[in-house]
Amino acid sequence: KRQHQGRFLDDILNGIYSICEETAWQLPAHNSYIRDTPQLILPDVTRPVMDLFACETGALLACAAYLLEEEFNAVSPFILTCIEDNLKRRILLPYLTAHFWWMGHDDEPMCNWTVWCTQNVLLTTFLMPWSVEMSSRLSSPVRTFCGNAPLFLPENTSDTVVTLQAILHKAAESCDYFLKDYGNDGCCEEGAQYYRHAGLCLYGAMTVLNTVTDCHFDTLFRWDKVKNIASYILNVHVNDKYYFNFADCSPIAGRAGVREYLFGKATGQEDLCLFAAKDFQAGQGQLVTDEVNGGNLFYRMQTVFHYEELMKQDTSGTLSHLSLIHISEPTRPEPIS
């Protein structure tokens, strides 16, 4: 049955205002400003910490504003004002004026935090109403995930365009730092479960960058390293819902779905698309229960927007990924204690 009758709006607004009234958005275990230092006992409200949870909270509010701008304004124009104020103060301003380790610097090793946070900062920025008109005036970055050339700014820009351009530049730079630590084989060092927070978040960040720059980053989806990052999840798949597991990854890493499918399309890999569509159908479309993406609103949006496309895919074909997997017998006669 179709909804959109307004009966959930009060609860949605209560949730939004509860989030906006929180003292801080970061997880207590992440309440520090320097990598691998002790956490502070209480948050400093004048210096927001940008961790995984803060960045994802920003993206959640931006998604809500994107989907329900008209409905919010029908209640009060101050709803969007409240959301915008919180996003500027807790996400955009610290992103542009502070340095957090996951943003990348020199040879410091990066991990999934880099693209996970970067994707959500980009969503926070470009899903909000303030960016709709301005983003069409952005110049494409001179640099393409390499080098240190500055960005050209369009002439006679407003402060908003300059801000968006700075965010675009910094996000592209962080993707550089993430890719420098990834092997050419595309292997996710933390296993199949973290592929969703590493490889797929790289895809998410690249997609936003590509969209707002009129496909400036399109050729990057053809890079061998990026293609290998995309197909990693297929190459470690065993059967049904089981994967080769290592590190702290479970052998049951959750069903593949829309994001894997879209990454496969972007990188031109039919096997990955077939695998994702087949797994999506096996999970009955993941609209009600999504064991991988949980309550992430943006991922749910992607599922809704592409649901029919995946459910209509002919998945009777045979996957060829098993030919890529080589298993060696251990040479050690006894188990390692």
Q: Where do the model's predicted regions map?
A:
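Aromatic-lined, polymer-binding surfaces characteristic
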Residues: 1-137, 145-237
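Carbohydrate-active enzyme catalytic cores, enriched for enzymes
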Residues: 152-153, 197-324, 328, 333, ...
